[in-house]
């Protein structure tokens, strides 16, 4: 027994790894990975496989995700066209808004441009039509003025209803004036001044005998009213174009429901 112990001590002394400079090689590293046996134990019978329901749910999600990605990354042609037209509309409206603020390039002409827009406002037109109706002494004149008043009231209600429904803001942060609040012309789409100018100009061209220069000036006035609303930053270009279309449609509607002279006289006498 003592002989075997002495032989074991001799082997330990002759072992190179038992020297002081190699003792660190025999010690396991701190914070190192666990031995493989622990990994085999973790993957043993005690580990439970995921339930079958989760796997089916993940497969369904993986099948749905590529379709959603394709829908987002490949929009339809209508969506691309609509977004492109909207971007062009905003860019043109920003460029044409040269009187939108005090720091704009045409800020000195803002008052004159706003004055042109006021000529297409509903309050002056309704007030002027009522005044002319009171002063008129002919049945034909009263008939035309009563139908014009009907067209103006129809325009205000139509524009206010569509603006309240869509609620589109203008290209610049401009607050509506007091006259705009009175006629409920608060939002941008459609442009109420443009629809009114188009409707009134078409009405006058159809029911008044005017010389050719006056007809040309009437059309130019309607175009200038619409352009002035874009220049002060109140409306987009598409708002004004839509206003022109709505004004023409309103004129056609008034022509369909035109009140005869007898109806106009009855309304005037009741008033």
UniProtKB/Swiss-Prot annotation:
Modified residues (Phosphoserine): 43, 62
Keyword Transmembrane assigned: yes
Stored Gene3D superfamilies: Phosphatidic acid phosphatase type 2/haloperoxidase (1.20.144.10)
PANTHER family, per database record: INACTIVE PHOSPHOLIPID PHOSPHATASE 7 (PTHR14969:SF17), SPHINGOSINE-1-PHOSPHATE PHOSPHOHYDROLASE (PTHR14969)
Listed SUPFAM superfamilies: Acid phosphatase/Vanadium-dependent haloperoxidase (SSF48317)
Keyword Transmembrane helix: yes
UniProtKB keywords: Endoplasmic reticulum, Membrane, Nucleus, Phosphoprotein, Transmembrane, Transmembrane helix
Name of the protein this chain belongs to: Inactive phospholipid phosphatase 7
Family listed: Belongs to the PA-phosphatase related phosphoesterase family.
Organism field: Homo sapiens (Human)
Function noted in UniProt: Plays a role as negative regulator of myoblast differentiation, in part through effects on MTOR signaling. Has no detectable enzymatic activity.
Any Gene Ontology biological process: negative regulation of myotube differentiation
Location in or out of the cell: Nucleus envelope; Endoplasmic reticulum membrane; Membrane
InterPro entries: P_Acid_Pase_2/haloperoxi_sf (IPR036938), P_Acid_Pase_2/haloperoxidase (IPR000326)
């Amino acid at each position: 027994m003592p002989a075997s112990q002495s032989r074991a001590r001799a082997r330990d002394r002759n072992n190179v790894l038992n020297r002081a400079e190699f003792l660190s090689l025999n010690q396991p590293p701190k914070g190192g990975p666990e031995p493989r046996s622990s990994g085999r134990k973790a993957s043993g019978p005690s580990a439970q496989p995921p339930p079958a329901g989760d796997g089916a749910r993940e497969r369904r999600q993986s099948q749905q995700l590529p379709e959603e990605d394709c829908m987002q990354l490949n929009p339809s042609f209508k969506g691309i066209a609509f977004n492109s037209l909207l971007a062009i509309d905003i860019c043109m409206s920003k460029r044409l808004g040269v009187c939108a603020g005090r720091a704009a390039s045409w800020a000195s002409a803002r008052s004159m441009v706003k004055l042109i827009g006021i000529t297409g406002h509903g309050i002056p037109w309704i007030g002027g039509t009522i005044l002319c109706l009171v002063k008129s002494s002919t049945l034909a004149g009263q008939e035309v003025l009563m139908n014009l008043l009907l067209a103006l009231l129809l325009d205000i209600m139509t524009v206010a209803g569509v603006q309240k429904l869509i609620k589109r803001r203008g290209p610049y942060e401009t607050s509506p004036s007091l006259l705009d609040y009175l006629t409920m012309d608060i939002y941008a789409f459609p442009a109420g001044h443009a629809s009114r100018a188009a409707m009134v100009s078409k009405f006058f061209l159809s029911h008044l005998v005017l010389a050719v220069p006056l007809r040309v000036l009437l059309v130019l006035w309607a175009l200038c009213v619409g352009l002035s609303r874009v220049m002060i930053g109140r409306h987009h270009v598409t708002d004004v174009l839509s206003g022109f279309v709505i004004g023409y449609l309103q004129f056609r509607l008034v022509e369909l429901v035109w009140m005869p002279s007898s109806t106009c006289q009855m309304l005037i006498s009741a008033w």
